[in-house]
Design a protein with these regions (language model features):
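Thioredoxin-like thiol-disulfide oxidoreductase module
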Residues: 2-20, 44
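Short amphipathic alpha-helical segments embedded in low-complexity Lys/Glu-rich regions
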Residues: 2-6, 26-28, 141-142, 266
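Short coil/turn linker and secondary-structure boundary residues
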Residues: 3-6, 33, 259, 290
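Alpha-helical interaction elements in eukaryotic regulators
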Residues: 7, 31-38, 230, 244, ...
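Noncatalytic linker/hinge segments flanking ATPase motor cores
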Residues: 13, 37-44, 179-184
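Short, structured active-site "lid" loops
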Residues: 13-33
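Non-catalytic, surface beta->alpha helical segment in thiol-disulfide oxidoreductase systems
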Residues: 27-47
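Non-heme di-metal
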Residues: 48-298
């Protein structure tokens, strides 16, 4: 992001009408326009989204806060093969129908939502954000999300024997209304016609609000000594998602053009209400001995 050496008025004075014939500028495939439109774009654009030649090399590190999170993610690598679910099957047989319903909905939500998160990073954020440190982190997060999705799919495949039910759970973002509502909200706010800052905040809400109730519920199973494979995977994934949330917040703090306070409140309020509805209605806490009011407060 380099200051232009020739101001608009000076250029007009030097070149007159010919200034309008300057080559048309495109950035990331988007037509910006002529020289004057390009100047206006630079004045209004978010600096971290502006392409620079620095993005092609890792060093020198300019944003130590982002780099530290990338290195932390790098050190926490794991694979789906590390999760042993063999002992879970005996516990699964002993669970009540309500408890099984509870776990099925959690796994179904996670299996689909990780795909939405993956697509948003891969198709949007990783391409838009030009900071080397952020691009490094997103490369690792894409890997994380694939491992998470594989793990949740593996758990569904292991626990559920009926092929029709299994198919319904794998397609939960279109077949199960409470999960569909969460997916639709995420895709609404991830739409790349929206300002980057709004999309980044909504992304943080998915990782920090939409996931939190389900993580908490699985930790409740661990407290009861049930489903060790599921609980171990939950520890690994919740740790990863906590780091992803920290990164989104750190990046958001660096933005020069943040959403209005009203928009911020709207995004967070919607996310909280949807998650409260999901955790109380789709996952009826009271049916398995959890306190729905306390979960809602959480």
């Amino acid at each position: 992001y380099t200051k232009l050496l020739v101001e608009k008025d000076e250029l007009k004075e030097r070149c007159g009408p010919r200034a309008a014939t300057y080559p048309q500028v495109k950035i990331n495939g988007e037509l910006i326009g002529d020289y004057f439109a390009f100047q206006e774009y630079l004045e209004e654009a978010e600096p971290m989204l502006l392409p620079t030649m620095n993005r092609f090399t890792v060093f020198p590190i300019e944003h130590e806060n982002l780099w530290a999170l990338y290195k932390k993610a790098q050190m926490s690598n794991w694979t789906a093969e590390e999760v042993d679910v063999s002992a879970d099957m005996e516990d699964w047989k002993s669970l009540t129908d309500n408890e099984k319903h509870f776990i099925k909905y959690i796994l179904a939500f996670f299996a689909g939502s990780d795909g939405i998160v993956f697509e948003n990073i891969n198709n949007n954020f990783a391409d838009e954000v030009q900071l080397t440190e952020a691009r490094s982190f997103y490369a690792y997060q894409v890997h994380n999300e694939m491992v998470h999705g594989e793990t949740y799919s593996k758990l569904i495949d292991k626990y559920i024997r009926d092929s029709a039910e299994k198919k319904k759970l794998f397609e939960a973002i279109t077949t199960i209304d409470p999960i569909k509502k969460k997916a639709e909200w995420a895709m609404k706010w991830f739409d790349n016609s929206r300002p980057f800052a709004e999309r980044l905040l909504a992304f943080a809400c998915v990782e920090g609000i939409f996931f939190s109730g389900s993580f908490c519920a699985i930790f409740w199973l661990k407290k009861r000594g049930l489903m060790p494979g599921l609980c171990f995977s939950n520890e690994l994934i919740s740790r990863d998602e906590g780091l992803h949330l920290d990164f989104a917040i750190e990046l958001f703090k660096m933005l020069q053009n943040k959403p209005s306070q009203d928009t911020i409140h709207e995004i967070v309020r919607e996310a909280v209400e949807i998650e409260k509805g999901f955790i109380i209605e789709a996952l009826p806490c009271s049916l398995i001995g959890m306190n729905a009011e306390k979960m809602s407060d959480y």
